């Protein structure tokens, strides 16, 4: 059987942060570290695999 999940379109995180003038600060504080993906033992912090393009998501 098929279950339909209703989706709602809203502004993306990137658009909201940009409208409030907070995008640059957010990107500085949450910059991705590609080295942690391929060399987790060499990364300074715990290795994580971030979602790519999560800031552009518009459907929830």
Swiss-Prot record:
It is an enzyme of class 3 (hydrolase). Its main location: secreted. GO terms for molecular function: aspartic-type endopeptidase activity. GO terms for biological process: digestion; proteolysis. It is found in: Secreted. Pfam families: A1_Propeptide. Keywords: Aspartyl protease, Digestion, Hydrolase, Protease, Secreted, Zymogen. Its EC number is 3.4.23.1. InterPro entries: Aspartic_peptidase_N. It catalyses: Preferential cleavage: hydrophobic, preferably aromatic, residues in P1 and P1' positions. Cleaves 1-Phe-|-Val-2, 4-Gln-|-His-5, 13-Glu-|-Ala-14, 14-Ala-|-Leu-15, 15-Leu-|-Tyr-16, 16-Tyr-|-Leu-17, 23-Gly-|-Phe-24, 24-Phe-|-Phe-25 and 25-Phe-|-Tyr-26 bonds in the B chain of insulin. One of its GO terms (cellular component) is extracellular region. Residues 1-45 form a propeptide. Belongs to the peptidase A1 family. Shows particularly broad specificity; although bonds involving phenylalanine and leucine are preferred, many others are also cleaved to some extent. This is Pepsin A.
């Amino acid at each position: 059987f098929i279950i339909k999940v209703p989706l709602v379109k809203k502004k993306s995180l990137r658009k909201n942060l940009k409208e409030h003038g907070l995008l640059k600060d957010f990107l500085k504080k949450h910059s991705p570290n590609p080295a942690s993906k391929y060399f987790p033992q060499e990364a300074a912090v715990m290795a994580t695999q971030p979602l790519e393009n999560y800031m552009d998501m518009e459907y929830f």
